[in-house]
Amino acid sequence: MLDSSPRPPVVDTSRSPHVRLRPVPLDAVDLADDFWEPRRRINREVTLPSQYRHLEDTGRLDNFRRASRKIGGGYQGIYFNDSDVYKWLEAAAWTLAEGSDSELERMVDAAITEIEDAQRPDGYLNTYFTFERAAQRWTDFDLHEMYCAGHLFQAAVAHFRATGSERLLDVATRFADHICDTFGPEEGKRHAVDGHEEVEMALVELFRATGERRYLEGAQFFIDARGHGLLGRPYGQHEPSYSQDHEPLRDQSEVVGHTVRALYLYSGAADVYAETGELALLQALRRLWENMTTRRMYVSGGLGSRYEGEAFGGTSSSPTSGPTLRPAPLLPA
């Protein structure tokens, strides 16, 4: 049964059996102070519309129109451009949860229409792997297919919780069903993991929104399958640790590799623990948390001290110049 309660939480662990803190509904807090409210207003009135124009100007939305044969031409931009559309939709959805905005709603609905029309009959959706690259689907796991899917799932859950609409959620569940039909531990399914983690936590949140247990089981599979060298050398140059594929998660004790990927993985594993209560996952996450917060983190909370590979540094290695310290590593956490 779909969770359609009014103004549910951003991350809904209200029915997760192994969590102690319970989220509050979106409308339980009103940030009307002098610090946050002006920034939220700028986000609604300036930032989100500007970003939507950028999605148009850079061809990101045109990639969806091309996939549905509304326009011709070639694919525009880097292979993970779809994810930027989904990230914008997630941000716009949570903004709409604060109150109606006809212009923002128009942009959101327009983007969802292009996404709906671009989806393949089997549920697959990635505009990079359309037409000339359709035969290459699920052949190169360095190309962020599941990463993009995960951001779609999170945008869909956000849109559903913020507006009650199931339009984008229907797209997401069709794609999630395709992934769960294609990948898994069962005979005849693909045993593989994506080079860039993200889908793990997204599948759990999709499970929380829909009650469809196969999505939770899919997240468990991708966590279980990582750490067995399925990726080889990412991008032909990095060690397996770059994508946390060097050792099973339950055996890890040090945070290594690409910081954003690692935190998506750890967050997804924490989500799985919240639903299953698997002690081995919790023990591993506690070790990794201890290592990260006492040996790899800046006093500001920043992570990712190496420019090369946007990676964690060595033990207690936190230079004051040169590191990336991007905001992205903190988002999953």
Residue ranges and their predicted role:
Residues 1-333:
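Glycan-recognition and catalytic cores of secretory/periplasmic carbohydrate-active enzymes
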